[in-house]
Amino acid sequence: VSVAGLTAGLCGSARAGHFDGVATVVAKLFGIVGPSTAYFGKKDAQQLAVVRRLASDLCLPVEIVGCPLVREPDGLAMSSRNRNLSSAERAAATVIHRGLRIGAEVVMAGERDAGTLRRVVANVLTTEPLVRLEYAEVVAADTLAPVEVLEGEVLVAVAARVGDVRLIDNMTVNVDVRGAGVDLGVTVAPTGEGLCAAR
């Protein structure tokens, strides 16, 4: 099963055929189980978009729910891959969230040029020697098509290698006539009790 138009860019550019595999497995799963609702994390925004398009294109009677991206207290997006980072790499990896956060500040200050936002995020990540940036992209949240101007719902997506570990992260930017809102996910409280909105 192939979902055209959503899989060529972002992670798909470095992982040929990956999302065709995802779409095929998910289509089989939905066919066997017949769920009314399915939950996918927003951290892998491209996968979520692919699954939503799959369900729509095949007219599957399933609601696809995006679950909030969850962060560690220091901002690093939660992932099973984090355990493979050394202590130095783990500390360095927080630059990914820092880049997104600084990008969010730029948007909230009024920046609407996607190229400028992309450069701001990328420049922050390249300050960390242990981090090798794969991409920092600004795309339409639904189609994943590159955008030039920030308007409507936009996804700022990042992929980077820290040591041998590949990490992804993103934030959603909503821009309308009233201004801009930014969704960086939710952050686990330092005590581990509950979740609090990210800022």
Description of each model-found segment:
Residues 1-2, 76-85, 147-153:
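Short, surface-exposed amphipathic charged segments that create phosphate/polyanion-binding patches used
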Residues 3, 7, 16, 57, ...:
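Generic secondary-structure boundary/loop-capping signal
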Residues 23, 47-50, 172:
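Hydrophobic side chains within alpha-helical segments
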Residues 14, 19, 43, 77, ...:
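Gly/Ser/Thr-rich beta-alpha loop segments that engage phosphate groups in nucleotides
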Residues 21-32, 81-84, 105-115, 175-182:
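Noncatalytic linker/hinge segments flanking ATPase motor cores
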Residues 1-39:
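Divalent-metal (Mg2+/Mn2+/Ca2+)-assisted nucleotide/phosphate chemistry catalytic cores
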Residues 37, 44-134, 139, 197-199:
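Glycine-rich, Lys/Arg-enriched anion-binding loops that position phosphate/diphosphate groups
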Residues 119-199:
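Phosphate/ribose-recognition catalytic cores of enzymes acting on nucleotide-derived substrates
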